[in-house]
Amino acid sequence: MSDYTKYTKQEMQAYAIAKSIKENQIVIVGTGLPLIGASLAKRAICPSCHPIVESGLMDCDPVEVPRSVGDNRFMAHCAVQWPNIRFVGFEANEWLHDEDRLVAFIGGAQIDPYGNVNSTCIFGKGDYLQPTTRFTGSGGANGIATYCNTIIMMQHQKRRFIDHVDYITSCGWMDGPGGREIGRAHV
């Protein structure tokens, strides 16, 4: 019998992602832990799930763990490769038809108590135009956070969990309960 008591926090997070995916769900994932978790789910836990990534690949079944959503190892065994433009709006359309069938996992550099995620930049002593650190940005995360049953998965470090994100890349409840109501002004 194998000893499964020696694992890293990241391995446990990837496993938690894989276990929360259900049969026949469409699973939108980005690079990193979400990609690893979805790959594990497809390979070992629920082979009828359908991972999809922002580069347009759907129903991926990688032989090896891909390094990014555009990795050729991901492309080799996917059912569909859409042009990126077709991915835009997919989440909204799927959500309108069956919101329980669609789940997504995103990460980020910062998250606040209202679920707003920053994956764009850390201001530090600067601002948006001259931040201390700049990241790749939204990718598809903004649409995912808006239209999908979204699970936010990030490394558990105190500096990531803050009162107000420096920049809202993907909105949660904006400034609190009711923060996503149509027509409500936000600051």
Question: What are these language model-derived features?
Answer:
Residues 2, 9-11, 65-184:
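Conserved phosphate- and dinucleotide-binding cores of soluble alpha/beta proteins
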